[in-house]
Amino acid sequence: MNSFLMHWTYAIPEIWVLTMACVVLLADLFWGDGLRDLAAVLTVLTLSGAAVLTVFEMGQSGTAFAGLFVLDRFTNVAELFSYLAVLMVVLYSRRYLVDRGIYRGEVFVLLLFALLGIMVMVSGGSLLSVYLGLELLALSQYALVAFYRDSVMATEAGLKYFVLGALASGLLLYGMSLLYGLTGTLDVRDIAADLVNMTAGNLVLVFAIVFIAAGIAFKLGAAPFHMWLPDVYQGAPTVVTAFLASAPKIGAFALIIRLLVDGGYGMQESWQQIFVALTVVSLVVGNVIAIAQQNIKRMLAYSTIGHVGFMLLGIVAGTEAGLASAFFYTVVYTLMSLAGFGMILLVSRAGFEAERIDDFKGLAQRKPWYAFLMMIVMFSMAGVPPTVGFYAKLAVFQAVVAAGYVWLAVVGVLLAVIGAFYYLRVVKVMYFDKPAPDAGLIVRDDLASMALSINSLALLVLGILPGPLMAFCFYAMRGVI
């Protein structure tokens, strides 16, 4: 009986989020028309409650439900950062959704179900639970991307995402099925133990690793599996894009940890070489093609591909320090992307999407504070000290050099310098170009403005004092290998 209760105790945050997602849906159904903010308020309460429950679990470890669920340091820390990302999206979203007539409870319900999918992925101890979490996240994302039915671009982006996402899920599932056929178990720890005794030349095992790596690369947005990313980021409502660029990246990182580190560490040399190729291609494609973009959402999409390349440097290192630096980079990228897309949301207004880089011309004259915040974001993405983006890049470079991949670090540094161009171009447009004649007024939004200020200034504060966040990420990854 005590063991049974302990199993449910481990999963209390997930149960809380699932229950509250249903409550938000029902509350919006019965009272949503009269109380327009009800769903958003309940969502914030859900995230706050989940954070409290997760904090109470800190320090505990174990498995539950016959190995389907794993509670460890990484589970707790990754879930906390996921709550933060979804909270920021909710705070940024209100005026944008109201202006477009889509401020409805379904948006927040889908966000909560997507969050639940991330939580299940992060805590998955079995191929089955990891895949179920992945599909829950993916289905919620497809619906969110196509939610704005009046937008042809959103509908088109949703269809593209669905078709390519289904293909990637199929690849991942096929790789998992091959692993199951080889080992006869779904438990990732048992799979890892069985793989130690297998030869690297086993053809079925090679195919399994390739298919799983391809599926993970798609979910991350790593090149050459990035085809969906620019179109979906550009076509989706900016609120949804802000979500896609943040919390799901933590979930994708969890896929690597659970499937390749926990489940395939015995075959590290095999999947490491695949990720070396993914890293180089992502760095080149993301940073070079972003230079040619005039649409800022599309530019940030290609920059995401580049950032994924930097994050994969830590994965390639394959050490505990490398994985911790990769997790640190993922968290920092999440904060940077939230601030970047949050600024696009603030500059947009009813009937106008601030999607072109030219829409930010003269922002320093129109809204000096917003321009300053956006400058911090761009500097952090470029890796300019003293922003936290610099320390994130430095951490992965140190890890990959320590692992013996000096040439890979050199490639990363060169492409970081190239990538700085398109970030600094946005700063130049804001400070040195005159506002366009049709620029219009920026509508005041106190809640989103306060959230953006905290988000952007955090990039500067964490750059001056990176130690606590870095230590927290290292704490999460301790003992993973």
From Swiss-Prot:
Highest taxon of source: Bacteria
Keyword annotations: Cell inner membrane, Cell membrane, Membrane, NAD, Quinone, Translocase, Transmembrane, Transmembrane helix, Transport, Ubiquinone
Catalytic activity: a quinone + NADH + 5 H(+)(in) = a quinol + NAD(+) + 4 H(+)(out)
GO molecular function, one term: NADH dehydrogenase (ubiquinone) activity
GO cellular component: plasma membrane
Top-tier EC class: translocase
Membrane topology: Multi-pass membrane protein
Pfam families: Proton_antipo_M
E.C. code: 7.1.1.-
Residues passing through the membrane, by range: 11-31, 38-58, 69-89, 107-127, 128-148, 162-182, 203-223, 237-257, 271-291, 299-319, 327-347, 370-390, 401-421, 457-477
An individual GO BP term: ATP synthesis coupled electron transport
Localization per record: Cell inner membrane
Function: NDH-1 shuttles electrons from NADH, via FMN and iron-sulfur (Fe-S) centers, to quinones in the respiratory chain. The immediate electron acceptor for the enzyme in this species is believed to be ubiquinone. Couples the redox reaction to proton translocation (for every two electrons transferred, four hydrogen ions are translocated across the cytoplasmic membrane), and thus conserves the redox energy in a proton gradient.
Family: Belongs to the complex I subunit 2 family.
Assembly and interaction partners: NDH-1 is composed of 14 different subunits. Subunits NuoA, H, J, K, L, M, N constitute the membrane sector of the complex.
NCBIfam families: NDH_I_N, PRK05777.1-5
Protein name per UniProt: NADH-quinone oxidoreductase subunit N
Gene behind the chain: nuoN
